Swiss-Prot record:
<dbReference type="GO" id="GO:0051607">
    <property type="term" value="P:defense response to virus"/>
</dbReference>
<comment type="function">
    <text>CRISPR (clustered regularly interspaced short palindromic repeat) is an adaptive immune system that provides protection against mobile genetic elements (viruses, transposable elements and conjugative plasmids). CRISPR clusters contain spacers, sequences complementary to antecedent mobile elements, and target invading nucleic acids. CRISPR clusters are transcribed and processed into CRISPR RNA (crRNA).</text>
</comment>
<dbReference type="InterPro" id="IPR053725">
    <property type="entry name" value="CRISPR_Cas5_sf"/>
</dbReference>
<protein>
    <recommendedName>
        <fullName>CRISPR-associated protein Cas5 3</fullName>
    </recommendedName>
</protein>
<dbReference type="InterPro" id="IPR013422">
    <property type="entry name" value="CRISPR-assoc_prot_Cas5_N"/>
</dbReference>
<comment type="similarity">
    <text>Belongs to the CRISPR-associated protein Cas5 family. Subtype I-A/Apern subfamily.</text>
</comment>
<keyword id="KW-0051">Antiviral defense</keyword>
<dbReference type="InterPro" id="IPR010153">
    <property type="entry name" value="CRISPR-assoc_prot_Cas5a-typ"/>
</dbReference>
<comment type="subunit">
    <text>Part of the aCascade ribonucleoprotein complex.</text>
</comment>
Amino acid sequence: MIYSKVFLKLHWGFSVVKPSAAKAKSGFYLPPPTTLIGALSYGKFRGIDNTNLGKIYGSPAYNFRNVMATARLESEGAYTEDIVRNVISYFQRKDRRDNPRYIYGVIPTGKVYMPNGTLVVVYVTDSMSKEELEKLSWSITRIGGKECLVSVENVEIGEAKKVSGRMKTRYYFRDTVKVVGKKEFLEYVTFWEENGYIWGKEGGPIRYILPVATYPLASKEVEVEAKEAYEVGGEYVVFS
């Protein structure tokens, strides 16, 4: 297994809304694995929004489903819900949908503001070469929405050493992982799995634990009992 640790400089922050979000779009404190994998795949599939996956169609990011990803905040930030002008016609009654008065509305949308802050993303995989992983890591341009621009400050490539047992981490992990010691900085969220890359299918929900303080928003270190984890440049990322 190899890993890529990517240090991303956020231009203003990022916004990734929660699954099944409707008219009120609350957001995540950290981008989920599917968002991180989509950002990595952009360097290879830029300009391709749809791909044939056999008998189905979906996002080209589906080809990267064997890549494991997680993230943490290197800087402090703030979560807020901005008022954003969005299309709301599909929430209206059928007789209202063609009325210009009901096409747009103001919607509270979750965002993490961290101007000039740093987001650290780790990818672990055995499905590509070090050279390709490094090239794609340097090609990341945004996280989340198209306006959530980032600049790659540094990329660290190396061998991911598989470990298990007790360890400390600041990266998020699935809630099936046992947390030991203090449990004061734990936020439970629902992400989704890779079937969400397939058009017309909904990704199954997966519960994760984010070791963060919510205000100011910052990643915190927690101790866990891991079955599958990897040492990546002096840190640990936990996947089960």
